[in-house]
Each structure stands twice: as structure tokens, then as C-alpha cells.
Amino acid sequence: MKLVNFLKKLRNEQVTIELKNGTTVWGTLQSVSPQMNAILTDVKLTLPQPRLNKLNSNGIAMASLYLTGGQQPTASDNIASLQYINIRGNTIRQIILPDSLNLDSLLVDQKQLNSLRRSGQIANDPSKKRRRDFGAPANKRPRRGL
């Protein structure tokens, strides 16, 4: 299963996204595009701490936050609340999933599962008995006693 298809199944989950510039975004994941662009709502945006060796690199992030209509964060905590954010896929460093997420059910690929059901390798309904043995060829009919 591709990573993007897995992320598409995480709709309405609370995730934390860390960006390549050090910004941390926490919010509810609404959708993920094939290019891994993520749309989040009810967002808390934490800007990275300014470094002394760079000239006001945090100012650019603050200016873009101001232009989008977000609330101006205080200088001490660098946290802003936004209603909506669209994150470009190539700026994402990592996506942190919640601990309560059931990964086993999300990692099942329905297309692959349906193709295995059609080929007869797995049963459609777990309550039904299998009609043929594993060792017998699939194209032969079962023998009936005379």
C-alpha cells in the first residue's frame, strides 16, 4: 500500500505534522491529495524558536501567518491558532499519528483483498465453510461418493 493511500484513510484524525523548517502543526486531518498535500482544520501552529545565527528567519513565517488572517502569536510561545491550513506535500518532514489509532485495520488494502477473494485464495465470509482443500487444484471439481 502506498503511503498516500494510507494517509487518505486518516480522515478526521488528530495528527501532528512537522515541517522541514521546524514548524509543528497539530490539527484534524481533512484530506490528503495524491501529491501528499494535507488539509487540516482547528489547527495549532507552533513556530520554531529563532536562532541567533540566522537573520530573522522566523519573521518570514510570522509575516505569512499574519497575511493568512491567523491570530498574532506572542513572542514567548510562538503558538498560533488557525481555523484552516493547507500544507504542501514536499514541505512535510514527518506525520505523527495518535497512539489510539488502530493501524491493523487501516493497513488492509481493500483492492488487494477483493482480488484475493475473486481468485478464491481467501473466503468471502468467515462463517462459511471452505468447499475445497488447499492441496487440491482450483480447476477440479470435488469428487462425490457413489
UniProtKB/Swiss-Prot annotation:
Stored InterPro entries: LSm4/Sm_D1/D3, LSM_dom_sf, Sm, Sm_dom_euk/arc
Domain Sm: 2-101
A Gene Ontology BP annotation from the UniProt entry: mRNA 5'-splice site recognition
Assembly description: Component of the Sm core complex, present in spliceosomal snRNP U1, U2, U4/U6 and U5. The core complex contains SMB1, SMD1, SMD2, SMD3, SME1, SMX3 and SMX2 (Sm proteins B, D1, D2, D3, E, F and G, respectively), and is probably a heptameric ring structure.
Keywords: Cytoplasm, mRNA processing, mRNA splicing, Nucleus, Ribonucleoprotein, RNA-binding
Highest taxon above the source species: Eukaryota
Description of its domains: C-terminal extension may function as a nuclear localization signal (NLS).
Taxonomic lineage of the native organism: Eukaryota, Fungi, Dikarya, Ascomycota, Saccharomycotina
A cellular component annotation (GO) from this entry: U2-type prespliceosome
Source organism of the structure: Saccharomyces cerevisiae (strain ATCC 204508 / S288c) (Baker's yeast)
Annotated region described as Disordered, given as residue ranges: 118-146
UniProt protein name: Small nuclear ribonucleoprotein Sm D1
Cell compartments where the protein resides: Nucleus; Cytoplasm
PROSITE patterns: SM
